[in-house]
UniProtKB/Swiss-Prot annotation:
A motif (RAD1-binding motif) lies at residues 17-25. CDD domains: HLD_clamp_RarA. Essential for sustained cell growth, maintenance of chromosomal stability, and ATR-dependent checkpoint activation upon DNA damage. Has a weak ATPase activity required for binding to chromatin. Participates in the recruitment of the 9-1-1 (RAD1-RAD9-HUS1) complex and RHNO1 onto chromatin, and in CHEK1 activation. Involved in homologous recombination by mediating recruitment of the MRN complex to DNA damage sites. May also serve as a sensor of DNA replication progression. The modification Phosphoserine is found at residues 71, 86, 359, 646, 656. Part of a DNA-binding complex containing RFC2, RFC3, RFC4 and RFC5. Interacts with RAD1 and RAD9 within the 9-1-1 (RAD1-RAD9-HUS1) complex. Interacts with RAD9B, POLE, SNU13 and MCM7. DNA damage promotes interaction with ATR or ATM and disrupts interaction with the 9-1-1 (RAD1-RAD9-HUS1) complex. Interacts (when phosphorylated) with NBN; promoting recruitment of the MRN complex to DNA damage sites. This is Cell cycle checkpoint protein RAD17. Keywords: ATP-binding, Cell cycle, Chromosome, DNA damage, Nucleotide-binding, Nucleus, Phosphoprotein. The gene is RAD17. One of its GO terms (biological process) is DNA repair.
Length: 681
């Protein structure tokens, strides 16, 4: 064997005296005297572990030589450790903003947050309750940094909530849990919600502890919550109760920061619905992604400083590479700085993209003005991924806008291919976007995207013939996804037909120079299908509960039987049946039917799935396999059913008729009578 292999074995007897066994107290092995490693300074700095001898090698020398270091060696090691830390410190922490002027946030957003802090903290009334602020925005747009910098400049303390980790088990805890002499075993545990409530109570009641370097000359403070306990995502009602209580007893403002998610999980709508925001008077400030121009200035500043300081140790990127990096990070300046540091390190030159020659086909098809834009844009999307850019995602509002406005690139008259004369009506300019990629980047099911498209496409057309053609494409797409046997296979084709059909049918927007339908902004709305489908299910359950003797399907019951019962003069003893028949079987005496109230779609809202349809419901839009065949499922029990508000009101009945009562009580009464008759026989 080699000496290197035997060296650890020789010094192993020395090392055992430095180690304190973990279970010596539990096993009651106290015969061996041990020495703690911390008291003798075994935990050296990273510099001493790197440059000095190893623990096994140094154990062969006397302890006197190992402990006595000259002052020159100590100073040299301290300076080297500081230099090592400064070189390896992340640039995100190294160049973090310290003042308002260094923030990569729009000035109006900074003024909006500063105005709220002045009104709720600096100008706060003595007996004013707890005020709540909700800050939303994409990751890396400067939400938390803005709050901390403004609080520091105005002398406001910040008490931040951090999710606690489970405490480590100690020896005494281990003994108490597995004590053989006791029949009771206690596991020390406290839920995160209980800890969060206790934190809010203590933070609003007591001041922050003064640590070394803190200046606590003011009693003004705020509570900052960015990482909520995970239990609130499963049970949001618990958070709502905490917010209601804090508004009553809180003594300082409470700020929540939630990052927008493009994966479909809308935490803002789950944790802070509109009802809670109105009830608790929660202010809402929404941050935008960092603009590429502002991000470019910050990256140039970092590159200039690092190039002057470490000229030969980093690779200085050019302007084109920085522009690609800014576009690929989707407004996340934190991700941009991290990617810049990683790509600028020595030996990572191949990570910076280099443009290749464009195809001759694209040069011939596109005009000179568009020839420089579109190939660069397509190539940029491929290059940014090599630098480590984020996946480009779209909110629903922007995704619908790209389909409905359908911008196109103009073609040259000579080189562009032309259709035959008998097909000239189908000729269009080239689209600037791929509809399938737009739907994919929206992170929405294709059927749900078709619902939003069907709700909003009419306002973007000018000719009725184009609307008819677009509706045919939407109907054909709905047929493809109608059968549950083939829905999973044809879903992508259905979405492609719907999006491309709507874009192709709009002749007013068929060419790049056309301004069909005007270029003005048009609001988008949520589908009315959800409300109508919910009303249909309520009527279905009501009809099955009130008319069980007819044994008819829901479609026949509501289209063939109930309308005729409303015209007959047969008296009925059940007041609930009378109210339901008048609600379903008679149309209101109005000459002009008003449209249903439409709910506007905001620019940062995700696709809404009907909450009553269940998690397993897939959209043909939103129903399960059984519902797509014609009737809703019986998942909702009849015992939990109640009449809708419009059917349970007494204002729709004539004065001679008795007032309707709950159908559930009538069902219970019938059951009791049947049980009584069966006992008598």
């Amino acid at each position: 064997m080699s000496k290197t292999f035997l060296r650890p074995k020789v010094s192993s007897t020395k090392v055992t005296d430095w180690v304190d066994p973990s279970f010596d107290d539990f096993l009651e092995c106290r015969d061996v005297s041990t020495i703690t490693a911390t008291s003798l300074g075994v935990n050296n700095s990273s510099h001493r572990r790197k440059n000095g001898p190893s623990t096994l090698e140094s154990s062969r020398f006397p302890a006197r030589k190992r402990g006595n270091l000259s002052s020159l060696e100590q100073i040299y090691g301290l300076e080297n450790s500081k230099e090592y830390l400064s070189e390896n410190e992340p640039w995100v922490d190294k160049y973090k903003p310290e003042t308002q002027h260094e923030l990569a946030v729009h000035k109006k957003k900074i003024e909006e947050v500063e105005t709220w802090l002045k009104a709720q903290v600096l100008e706060r009334q003595p007996k004013q309750g707890g005020s709540i602020l909700l800050i939303t925005g994409p990751p890396g747009c400067g939400k938390t940094t803005t709050i901390k910098i403004l609080s520091k400049e105005h002398g406001i303390q910040v008490q931040e909530w951090i999710n606690p980790v489970l405490p480590d088990f100690q020896k005494d805890d281990f003994k108490g849990m597995f004590n053989t002499e006791s029949s009771f075993h206690m596991f020390p545990y406290q839920s995160q919600i209980a800890v969060f409530k206790e934190f809010l109570l203590r933070a609003t009641k007591y001041n922050k502890l003064q640590m070394l370097g803190d200046d606590l000359r003011t009693d003004k403070k705020i509570i900052l919550v960015e990482d909520l306990p995970n239990q609130f995502y499963r049970d949001s009602h618990t958070l709502h109760e905490v917010l209601r209580k804090y508004v009553r007893i809180g003594r300082c403002p409470l700020i929540f920061i939630i990052s927008d998610s493009l994966s479909g999980d809308n935490n803002q709508r789950l944790l802070f619905p509109k009802e809670i925001q109105e009830e608790c008077s929660i202010s809402n400030i929404s941050f935008n992604p960092v603009a590429p121009t502002i991000m470019m200035k910050f990256l140039n500043r970092i590159v200039t400083i690092e190039a002057n300081k470490n000229g030969g140790k980093i690779t200085v990127p050019d302007k084109t590479s920085l522009e690609l990096l800014c576009q690929g990070c989707s407004g996340d300046i934190r991700s941009a700085i991290n990617s810049l540091q990683f790509s600028s390190s020595k030996g990572e030159n191949n990570l910076w993209p280099r443009k290749k020659g464009m195809s001759l086909k694209s040069d011939a098809v596109l005009s000179k003005s568009k020839q420089r834009k579109k190939p660069d844009r397509v190539f940029e999307n491929q290059e940014v991924q090599a630098i480590g850019g984020k996946d480009v995602s779209l909110f629903l509002f922007r995704a619908l806008g790209k389909i409905l406005y359908c911008k196109r690139a103009s073609l040259t008259e000579l080189d562009s291919p032309r259709l035959p004369s008998h097909l000239s009506e189908y000729e269009r300019d080239t689209l600037l976007v791929e509809p399938e990629e737009v739907v994919e980047m929206s992170h929405m099911p294709g059927d749900l995207f078709n619902l939003y498209l069907h709700q909003n496409y009419i306002d973007f057309f000018m000719e009725i013939d184009d609307i008819v053609r677009a509706s045919e494409f939407l109907s054909f797409a709905d047929i493809l996804s109608g059968d549950w046997n083939t829905r999973s296979l044809l879903r992508e084709y259905s979405t492609s037909i719907a999006t491309r059909g709507v874009m192709h049918s709009n002749k007013a927007r068929g060419y790049a120079h056309c301004q069909g339908g005007g270029s003005s902004f048009r609001p988008l709305h949520k589908p009315q299908w959800f409300l109508i489908n919910k009303k249909y299910r309520e009527n279905y359950l009501a009809a099955k509960a009130l008319f069980p003797d007819f044994c008819l399907p829901a479609l026949c019951l509501q289209t063939q039987l109930l309308p005729y019962l409303a015209l007959l003069t047969i008296p009925m003893r059940n007041q609930a049946q009378i109210s339901f028949i008048q609600d379903i079987g008679r149309l209101p005496l109005k000459r002009h039917f008003g449209r249903l109230k439409m709910e506007a779609l905001t620019d940062r809202e995700h696709g809404m799935i009907d909450p009553d349809s269940g998690d397993e419901a897939q959209l043909n839009g939103g129903h399960s396999a059984e519902e797509s065949l014609g009737e809703p499922t019986q998942a909702t029990a009849l015992e939990t059913w109640s009449l809708p508000l419009s059917q349970n009101s007494a204002s729709e009945l004539p004065a001679s008729q008795p007032q309707p009562f709950s159908a559930q009580g009538d069902m219970e009464e019938n059951i009791i009578i049947e049980d009584y008759e069966s006992d008598g026989t």
